[in-house]
């Protein structure tokens, strides 16, 4: 599947939100948009621009390109409940996101690689599709040959217990996690407003 291969740091500066650990450190030093006039850009932002920016935030945070993101939106519309909430929940159930939330990788991009390279199993079966939808009760763990990889061990050792969300039970010692439940929207702390995205696609 195609992926964004540009500078995530530049995108982070343009959107004003850290999209990776590296970008977070960079934004602390240079909290303004890139380019010659990054520090002096002013003026009223249009409604469309605000909606587009929120969509870009969501796409880059979860590492998804436009076609797939629009498909998630269509699925969210088809489900019962609030469309925006449904959209966020679908993104949170992605396997690469659950791997990231479980502390197995310091970034979603790294988690995506772990999944794509076939290092993980779900309920005992190998899954190498980052977009795989995890369900309540699913057990995510590493294949025998992939256990105790340096990057994973390092990420887990640096992850405080407070990082792990209430809807995922993480066993750091055995490098496994159980997806307990689909999180409620208020439990997901991410810097975007999905309602503006819904308004954008509803036009």
Curated annotation (Swiss-Prot):
Gene3D superfamilies: Ribosomal Protein S4 Delta 41, Chain A, domain 1, RNA-binding S4 domain. Residues 93-173 form the S4 RNA-binding domain. Keywords: Ribonucleoprotein, Ribosomal protein, RNA-binding, rRNA-binding. It holds the Pfam family Ribosomal_S4. GO terms for molecular function: rRNA binding; structural constituent of ribosome. GO terms for biological process: ribosomal small subunit biogenesis; translation. Coiled coil: none annotated. One of its GO terms (cellular component) is small ribosomal subunit. One of the primary rRNA binding proteins, it binds directly to 16S rRNA where it nucleates assembly of the body of the 30S subunit. Belongs to the universal ribosomal protein uS4 family. Part of the 30S ribosomal subunit. Contacts protein S5. The interaction surface between S4 and S5 is involved in control of translational fidelity. This is Small ribosomal subunit protein uS4. It comes from Chlorobium limicola (strain DSM 245 / NBRC 103803 / 6330).
């Amino acid at each position: 599947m195609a992926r964004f291969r540009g500078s995530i740091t530049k995108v982070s500066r343009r959107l004003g939100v850290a999209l990776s650990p590296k970008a977070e450190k960079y934004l602390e030093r240079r909290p303004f948009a890139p380019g010659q006039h990054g520090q002096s850009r002013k003026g009223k932002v249009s409604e469309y621009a605000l909606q587009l920016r929120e969509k870009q935030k969501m796409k880059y945070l979860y590492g998804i390109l436009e076609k797939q993101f629009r498909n998630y939106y269509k699925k969210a519309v088809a489900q019962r409940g609030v469309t925006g909430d449904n959209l966020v929940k679908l993104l949170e159930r992605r396997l690469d996101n659950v791997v990231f939330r479980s502390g197995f990788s310091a970034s979603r991009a790294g988690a995506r690689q772990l999944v794509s390279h076939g290092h993980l199993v779900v309920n005992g079966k190998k899954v190498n599709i980052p977009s795989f939808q995890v369900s309540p009760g699913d057990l995510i763990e590493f294949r025998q040959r992939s256990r105790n990889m340096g990057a994973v061990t390092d990420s887990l050792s640096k992850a405080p217990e407070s990082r792990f969300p209430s809807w995922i039970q993480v066993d750091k010692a055995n490098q496994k996690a159980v997806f307990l439940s689909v999180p409620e929207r208020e439990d997901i702390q991410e810097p975007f407003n999905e309602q503006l995205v819904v308004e954008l696609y509803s036009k």
